[in-house]
């Protein structure tokens, strides 16, 4: 039996996140040398990373970091395989560390984020791979948003009380208004609009909706002369449902979101909604 103590096992677990039996086995093989045991477990963990590549990661957390002056903010999704891992402190600490890194560095895109150094000599990709190895599940970082051109606010929604936030919304206004920012972000979390405004809907999507409206109207046997008016009405209904500014405001459904913003004298410049796994 190798010469090591319970304290060595505890230390190794804290350093690697590996299970107790794996730590004991590694210490046995390393003859009680903690550093060699750490190296052995990390090598074993990296082999496990490769094995987990084909597995699905549909659980996880959305994390936000907002500057004290609301001049900037970020939203980051980190995914894992099970809600058990998502609830854990180590997973949530990893997600928070990545979000703080994004807030400090403002990477241009995901590729730049993964290649950036979150710690001296360690890229974000290596950090994620290390979490993968330590937690024993596939860990995926593939979405984030970073705003820094207005008044930025976030709303985080928990779908289950014992889980970290599963839905996150980041909004950017042209001027400070905490009440409107919060209300609109809550609306976005609940109603999941696909686009900000009518002008943001891609032309091919509009044409597809128009064709569906025309075919549906004809199938209903409506007069051909009435077709254009009916189709436009249905297309406007699509815009009302699919665009944030066209939707009835969640906190006052007698007004559209656009009307609420106009009355407050603010412009919503952009938004991002992230729901874990979707």
Curated annotation (Swiss-Prot):
It comes from the Bacteria. GO terms for molecular function: translation elongation factor activity. Residues 82-85 are annotated as: Involved in Mg(2+) ion dislocation from EF-Tu. PROSITE patterns: EF_TS_1 (PS01126), EF_TS_2 (PS01127). GO terms for cellular component: cytoplasm. Keywords: Cytoplasm, Elongation factor, Protein biosynthesis. Gene3D superfamilies: 1.10.286.20, DNA helicase RuvA subunit, C-terminal domain, Elongation factor Ts, dimerisation domain. It is found in: Cytoplasm. CDD domains: UBA_EF-Ts. PANTHER family: ELONGATION FACTOR TS, ELONGATION FACTOR TS, MITOCHONDRIAL. Associates with the EF-Tu.GDP complex and induces the exchange of GDP to GTP. It remains bound to the aminoacyl-tRNA.EF-Tu.GTP complex up to the GTP hydrolysis stage on the ribosome. Belongs to the EF-Ts family. NCBIfam families: tsf (TIGR00116). This is Elongation factor Ts. It comes from Streptomyces avermitilis (strain ATCC 31267 / DSM 46492 / JCM 5070 / NBRC 14893 / NCIMB 12804 / NRRL 8165 / MA-4680). The lineage of its organism: Bacteria, Bacillati, Actinomycetota, Actinomycetes, Kitasatosporales.
